[in-house]
Amino acid sequence: MARRRKGRPVNGVILIDKPTGITSNDTLQKVKRIYFAEKAGHTGALDPLATGMLPICLGEATKFSQFLLDSDKRYRVVAKLGERTNTSDSDGEVVQTREVKVDRGQLERCIAKFRGTTDQIPSMFSALKYQGRPLYEYAREGIEVPRESRKITVYSIELLRFEGHEVEMEVHCSKALTFVRLPTILGEMLGCGAHVTYLRRTGVSNYPYENMVTIEDLEALLEQAHREERAPRELLDPLLMPMDSAVQDLPEVNMIPELADHVLHGQPVQVFGAPQDGIVRMTSGDERLFIGVGHIDDDGRVAPKRLVVFRDEEEK
């Protein structure tokens, strides 16, 4: 007898507007429950303090979540000058207070120094994991663990507001930037200390900001479906982005269904017009059905790397 699945095979990406004070994993579990999804995974944790865009992959889309984890991000951050906390953010205790003698010109010159590529050691109060646990859990227990420096790139950083002791900035960066570190470093550059009071992720890859939904939105739709005696999927599934939206930045290789069938059985194929190397997004037929991610092998063929598993309708 086949083992009964826990959940349904729903596939796609939902853009959640994560609230503050909740972990990314807690958010993931709530979405998985609401969708009654068989599989779910997020695409890079946000610190509990942070709000904003958290793409959650459901079903087969989880196979491609790494591409979103590696993608560029956009943030809006507010820092308070003159106070340093033991966590580098407003959740911690103030451990040092200093006078703020900073003008806008000095601030803009310091901010400009963040642009470009540098090495950064992650903060102990970040959501990055060490041996399966977020760093901030170790930090709250007074334990410091080794962290390797990582290359980070800040493509742009703009000063939006400087009022009193508050500084608001907008940042476009690579995946590795640990945001609680940025205001801390800025504060030391200015000689007054600083910590994060507000952090919001406004963008991941090219996903539209306006497509975000809250957990409350999803719960309301679930309640509506129960009230109207409808299948929840009728109201919830239209909010999903296609699973290949996670790999939209990859070059597409479209192939005839006969070749796609070979690929889906693990065989590399020769496709006219394919790139000479690199990772590609594979589609089949005139309808451009997404079948997975491949790579160009040493013989110039398109070889499967991550494939979508298609199920018969009766399984759904």
UniProtKB/Swiss-Prot annotation:
Catalytic activity: uridine(55) in tRNA = pseudouridine(55) in tRNA
GO molecular function: RNA binding; tRNA pseudouridine(55) synthase activity
Residue ranges of the TM segments: none
Organism superkingdom: Bacteria
Keywords: Isomerase, tRNA processing
Biological processes annotated in GO: mRNA pseudouridine synthesis; tRNA pseudouridine synthesis
tRNA processing keyword on record: yes
Enzyme class (EC, first level): isomerase
EC nos: 5.4.99.25
Residue positions of the active site: D47 (nucleophile)
Record bears the keyword tRNA processing: yes
Cross-referenced InterPro entries: PsdUridine_synth_cat_dom_sf, PsdUridine_synth_N, PUA-like_sf, PUA_sf, tRNA_psdUridine_synth_TruB, tRNA_sdUridine_synth_fam1_C, TruB_C
Family that this chain belongs to: Belongs to the pseudouridine synthase TruB family. Type 1 subfamily.
Function: Responsible for synthesis of pseudouridine from uracil-55 in the psi GC loop of transfer RNAs.
Protein's UniProt name: tRNA pseudouridine synthase B
